[in-house]
């Protein structure tokens, strides 16, 4: 029996404090809020396919501007701060932020700071579940660190 067959159980994705130990840096909250609202508007008005293509295009255009080495302390600080900022501002908006909006917004915010994330959507068969998350350097940001082993990725940007 593989680890993926164990799955992640009855998963209710929320902003668990255990995954957001870092306080957001000053100034990042407003950018996080703008990014979250823009992502929600794009998904609501243009749909999933357009939002995914938009993220692909943004990542392709920003690939040349990635400048922080993944092992630097500044890189790690920005990653943790961005994940915490999106989680915090998600509590301010008048709608429930799901994993898709959170992960797309986090990916966009990281790209704007010169960090290249990997956006993933994965599934498990039983109980059927799909979930979106973000990784940087093989580490899950703002979510269960065991997701890559417990879910089968079907989309990666």
Predicted segments, located by residue:
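Acidic, low-complexity glycine/serine/threonine-rich segments
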Residues: 98-102
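N-terminal accessory/pre-domain segments preceding catalytic cores
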Residues: 1-71, 78, 87-95, 112-113, ...
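Hydrophobic/aromatic-rich core segments of domains that either
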Residues: 81, 85, 104-157
């Amino acid at each position: 029996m593989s680890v993926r067959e164990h799955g992640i159980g009855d998963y209710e994705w929320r902003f668990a404090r255990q995954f957001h130990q870092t306080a957001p840096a000053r100034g990042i909250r407003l950018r996080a809020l703008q990014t979250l609202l823009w992502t929600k508007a794009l998904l609501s008005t243009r749909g999933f396919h357009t939002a995914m293509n938009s993220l692909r295009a943004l990542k392709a255009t920003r690939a040349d501007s990635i400048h922080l080495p993944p092992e630097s302390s500044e890189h790690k600080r920005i990653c943790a701060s961005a994940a915490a900022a999106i989680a915090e501002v998600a509590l301010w908006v008048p709608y429930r932020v799901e994993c898709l909006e959170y992960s797309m917004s986090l990916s966009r915010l990281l790209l704007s700071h010169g960090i290249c994330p990997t956006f993933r959507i994965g599934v498990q068969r039983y109980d059927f579940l799909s979930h979106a998350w973000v990784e940087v350097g093989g580490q899950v940001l703002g979510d269960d660190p065991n997701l890559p082993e417990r879910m089968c990725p079907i989309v990666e940007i």
